[in-house]
Amino acid sequence: MGQLIDGVWHDTWYDTKSTGGRFKRTEAVWRNWVTADGSAGPTGNAGFAAERDRYHLYVSLACPWAHRTLLMRQLKGLEEMISVSVVHPLMLENGWTFDDDFPDATGDSLYQNEFLYQLYLHADPQYTGRVTVPVLWDKTQHTIVSNESADIIRMLNTAFDAQGARAGDYYPPELRDKIDELNGWIYDTVNNGVYKSGFATSQAAYDESVTALFHSLARLEQILGQHRYLTGDHLTEADLRLWTTLVRFDPVYVTHFKCDRHRISDYRNLSGFLRDIYQMPGIADTVNLPHIRHHYYCSHKTINPSGVISLGPAFDWDEPHGRG
């Protein structure tokens, strides 16, 4: 869990001393966009046109942020257009690595790097910042397009439609205001909320984050009691963004991040929602619980020094979801 400073790798944990024990996530640095015609997107530079086999995703199967991009890639049928490399789930003094001695870890098929930070240095030899996944890489310009998952899923949603992507709009114009509103508080209190709880180094910071987290889960349980998905009957990116956190909640966050007021399995609607999306064609293939559990329990030595992996609660993913 380190970072690059002026192109040099430093093995450093998050600094919470200056924030009252509160975890503060840094913003993504690369914010370019792939667009249908290569014109500039909402942020960043132009020049990234949607083309078959031009782009490559670097992901961790453990990471909820990277998982979003794999979901959208699958839903839009982009598996043959956008290739993927999967890092090793264990992240220690060198950050994410391309070791391939764990099932489904692929190594770096493009450059045969040992570490993900080397890819960042390929894009910017003087880069300063965290080295995170996902990374959307341009194989033509040999650079990072984006390392912001929220942006990448919107690119995959529409940019490749003219290239033969599967039909489906997960950010439709008529729902965008509602989706943006949901994304805002779900990100702050749930997606990032589990990390703010788990990485807190003061009681006050933990209490604040975990209280907000379970308040939001109760709110989501109520919303999902009214309709199948967060905005109604249409699956949107808001559902996908929430879902990747819910996948990891009972197996990891309850124990490892001390988010233990309730389990997702204790919520009728949230657990049904979790199963509903999991049982959609191809979605189960994006879920890798061995990577998830190994990453969290074995990588975060400040939280779990022994590296012992919790057994975790049982959950039947294939039980009828009772929704729709």
Question: How would you describe each model-predicted region?
Answer:
Residues 1-324:
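C-terminal alpha-helical interaction module
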